[in-house]
Amino acid sequence: MNMLMVMLVNITLSSCLIMIAFWLPQLNLYTEKANPYECGFDPMSSARLPFSMKFFLVAITFFLFDLEIALLLPLPWAIQMYNINTMMLTAFILVSVLALGLAYEWMQKGLEWTE
């Protein structure tokens, strides 16, 4: 019952915050909101620079593998648990899913930097 209550509160709070985040930006619509701030002067050029999609994919891949290391770091301490099979299976599934994702991105040539 306690876990159900915690999950219900978390889901409710998350839903409320997401709805507020989508609702609030629609209140203040004016043209100067999209312009960059340059000490009160009119902007000299566009502040919107094109963003490389290849860089974005490499950055996301780096972030995912960094997260994988953070999740697998406590694995040596988990060996002391009584149910080691469950922990090892979970770690194996995590590494397998990330390896499959890396193989897919590699086959789709998402990691090649040259265009």
From Swiss-Prot:
It is found in: Mitochondrion inner membrane. Keywords: Electron transport, Membrane, Mitochondrion, Mitochondrion inner membrane, NAD, Respiratory chain, Translocase, Transmembrane, Transmembrane helix, Transport, Ubiquinone. It catalyses: a ubiquinone + NADH + 5 H(+)(in) = a ubiquinol + NAD(+) + 4 H(+)(out). GO terms for biological process: mitochondrial electron transport, NADH to ubiquinone. It is an enzyme of class 7 (translocase). The keyword Glycoprotein does not apply. Its main location: mitochondrion. The chain crosses the membrane at residues 4-24, 55-75, 87-107. It is a multi-pass membrane protein. Its EC number is 7.1.1.2. Pfam families: Oxidored_q4. Gene3D superfamilies: NADH:ubiquinone/plastoquinone oxidoreductase, chain 3. One of its GO terms (cellular component) is mitochondrial inner membrane. Core subunit of respiratory chain NADH dehydrogenase (Complex I) which is composed of 45 different subunits. Interacts with TMEM186. Interacts with TMEM242. Belongs to the complex I subunit 3 family. PANTHER family: NADH-UBIQUINONE OXIDOREDUCTASE CHAIN 3 (PTHR11058:SF9). This is NADH-ubiquinone oxidoreductase chain 3. The lineage of its organism: Eukaryota, Metazoa, Chordata, Craniata, Vertebrata. The gene is MT-ND3.
